[in-house]
Amino acid sequence: MTTLSNLSVDLVGEIFSRVPLISLSEVRCTCTTWNTLSWNILSENYVFGKADTSKQFLGFVVMNSKVCSLRLDLQGIHNNDFVDPSLKEINIVDQYDISNIFHCDGLLLCVRWIQPRSKYHKFHRLDMYAFGYDKQQQEPDEETVTLSCIRDEQLAVLYQPYDLCLDLFMEI
């Protein structure tokens, strides 16, 4: 009996080529191999066959201090068809006043602005943030994230796309 993890790479690629990007989260949960292949498609634009995923966009925006996911299907844009964007508010951070967001390598970093402690604080337009993980751990935890910041802000790692697995708020 053939299992999902034993399917040929070409067949899995054909399946991915028919799955819209906005529905990929359900496919990623199928098995570890499919999860890995989906990351190749998303992060490296490695697409098997004639994939429709290369014509889709997923991003994040801040509107009225609310974090929203923006999904845009670009199929048909060359045929002058109307491209209907999908804008969905992420309600998990409603109680926070988000001022800025950053998206990198599957993590969404939300920054909440607070009043600087010093009246001489000059970094307003030069804000810099960084996040990553510690590779020297014996058993790396995918949900462990190290945050750093050059100013007095509250930072939050909200979640990995397609998987609400981490909800951590801390003051630096």
Swiss-Prot record:
InterPro entries, sorted: F-box-like_dom_sf, F-box_dom
Domain F-box, chain residue ranges per copy: 1-51
Pfam families: F-box
Superkingdom classification of source: Eukaryota
Protein name: Putative F-box protein At3g13825
Organism: Arabidopsis thaliana
